[in-house]
C-alpha cells in the first residue's frame, strides 16, 4: 500500500508543488513515516489529524513538513474568485459552518474517509485520498467540484 500511495502522490505532485495534507498521515512508526516522507514530492504542510503521533513525536519527521498546524486559512490567487483570491479553510474534521462560509470560502477536510454525504448546498468537500482513488486532489479539481455547488446558509447568517 505504501508503494502505491507514494507512486500516486508523485504522479500528480511536482517537486515544487505545495501540498496540504489534512491529517492522518501515518499510523506507523516515526522511522517508517520518515522513509515515506522522504520519497514524496512537494512542499508538504500538515493539518493535524487524530493519527499523527508517529509524525509529531520525532523532530526528524516534523522537519519534513514546511509547517504543522491544527487549522489553517489558505488564500489562493484565482482570477475567477471574488477579489481574485479564493479563501479555503483547512481542518482535519468536517464543519457545518466556517470562517467566511457565507462569503464564498471553501472548507476542505479529511477524517471521514468518504463516509459523509456530499452536500450540494455547502462549499465543503472531503479531500481524503481514500475518497479519490488514493490520489491527492488538486486545486483545479476542487474548483471544478465547488463550481457545481451553491452555498445556502443553515444558520442565522446571510
Task: Report the location of each language-model feature.
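Core catalytic region of metal-dependent phosphoesterases/phosphodiesterases
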Residues: 1-73
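Conserved beta-sheet core of the metallophosphoesterase superfamily
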Residues: 62-154
Amino acid at each position: 500500500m505504501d508503494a502505491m500511495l507514494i507512486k500516486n502522490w508523485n504522479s500528480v505532485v511536482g517537486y515544487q508543488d505545495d501540498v496540504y495534507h489534512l491529517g492522518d498521515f501515518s499510523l506507523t512508526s516515526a522511522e517508517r513515516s520518515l522513509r515515506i516522507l522522504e520519497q514524496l514530492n512537494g512542499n508538504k504542510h500538515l493539518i493535524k489529524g487524530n493519527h499523527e503521533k508517529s509524525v509529531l513525536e520525532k523532530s526528524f519527521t516534523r522537519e519534513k513538513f514546511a509547517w504543522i498546524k491544527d487549522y489553517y486559512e489558505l488564500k489562493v490567487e484565482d482570477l475567477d474568485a471574488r477579489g481574485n483570491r479564493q479563501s479555503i479553510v483547512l481542518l482535519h474534521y468536517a464543519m457545518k459552518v466556517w470562517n467566511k462560509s457565507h462569503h464564498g470560502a471553501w472548507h476542505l477536510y479529511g477524517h471521514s474517509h468518504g463516509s459523509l454525504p456530499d452536500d450540494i448546498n455547502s462549499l465543503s468537500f472531503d479531500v481524503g485520498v481514500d475518497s479519490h482513488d488514493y490520489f491527492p486532489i488538486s486545486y483545479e479539481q476542487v474548483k471544478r467540484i465547488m463550481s457545481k455547488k451553491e452555498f445556502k446558509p443553515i444558520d442565522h447568517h446571510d
